[in-house]
Amino acid sequence: MSRVNLAAPANHVVPRAAQEEVQGEYQTASNNWAVAAMASAGAAVGAAVLAMRRRATNTYEAIREDPEAVLAGAGRAMGAALIGAAVAGSANAASLTYDELQSLSYLEVKSSGIAGTCPVLADGVSSKLSLKAGKYEINNWCLEPSSFQVKLPPTEKQQVTEFERTKLMTRLTYTLDAISADLNVGGDGSWTIQEKDGLDYAATTVQLAGGERVPFLFTIKNLLAKGDAGQFLGQFDVPSYRGATFLDPKGRGGASGYDTAVALPASGDDEEYAKENSKSTAASVGTIAFKVAKVNAETGEIAGVFESIQPSDTDLGAKVPKDIKTSGVWYAQISPSK
């Protein structure tokens, strides 16, 4: 039986049309494979994000019902309203103690979500911190929000006002950190806290279900709180979201710019335009309540949950502010005053 030579002759030339046909089929197969791979990866990522969102929601609900049990068991809260991509970034961040956070390098923190988290207490107990009467300092005070809600005005169908969950629009830059305060403990065990300095405000924007976006300054600036070793509450100043030199689209500002809209100089004093023309940077007032859930008497570390209610941005006095309810976890270090 003779063998058949399947090799093409040396002088054989493959037609150009045949080459283009083979290349086209190969490119089509490659594109189909890439699309299928991307679809599969997208489905996997989507499922992972949804799973993390469900875990975050369940954790937040547990915090609301029993904060001490959650902090004692898990150490920190991952809120339901770390919305969208924020959920994935923060859910991957590990719960770390203060010393563990300080030992991390820049590259270890970069793009991990850890920079926006507060330390946790690994060896703390769920009890009050017993302090003698005297003056103390609060350092490295950290507030990490887990939920932002906006109070909606009453409607014809629903006369009772309630807070609506929102979607976070800004990046993971809403955590307040490195805050210092003075603590005065009275002879009866009462606490008086006066906030002094630190990263005590963060510009934040959330979005309602209907698409409306609500900007506000999450803050505890100039907080004056009173209570005891178990819980304390107080009021704080809410600075204007915009400064006096900010100019609106019409070029109007508080300390600079036009007095009225350029196209309506004669109507500048009309009531309809007065609120837009007269810019105000006056501060507002917010309230906040802290509950202690975990302490470490040896290190002076203390942690718990908080809930604050404050007004939103007023667009320099042109809009009626909305009430913002912020819930989350906090951490601080207490030491005798120097």
From Swiss-Prot:
Q: Does the keyword Flavoprotein apply?
A: no
Q: Does the keyword Ribonucleoprotein apply?
A: no
> Which molecular function GO terms apply here?
oxygen evolving activity
**Alphabetical keyword list:** Chloroplast, Manganese, Membrane, Photosynthesis, Photosystem II, Plastid, Thylakoid, Transit peptide
Q: What is this protein called?
A: Oxygen-evolving enhancer protein 1, chloroplastic
Protein family:
Belongs to the PsbO family.
What's a GO biological-process term for it? photosystem II assembly
- Please provide one cellular component term from the Gene Ontology annotations of this protein: photosystem II oxygen evolving complex
Protein source organism: Euglena gracilis
Q: How does it assemble?
A: Monomer.
- The residue span given for the transit peptide is 1-93
Q: Where in the cell is it found?
A: Plastid, Chloroplast thylakoid membrane
Domain of life, source organism: Eukaryota
Q: What does this protein do?
A: Stabilizes the manganese cluster which is the primary site of water splitting.
Enumerate the InterPro entries for this protein.
OMP/PagP_b-brl (IPR011250), PsbO (IPR002628)
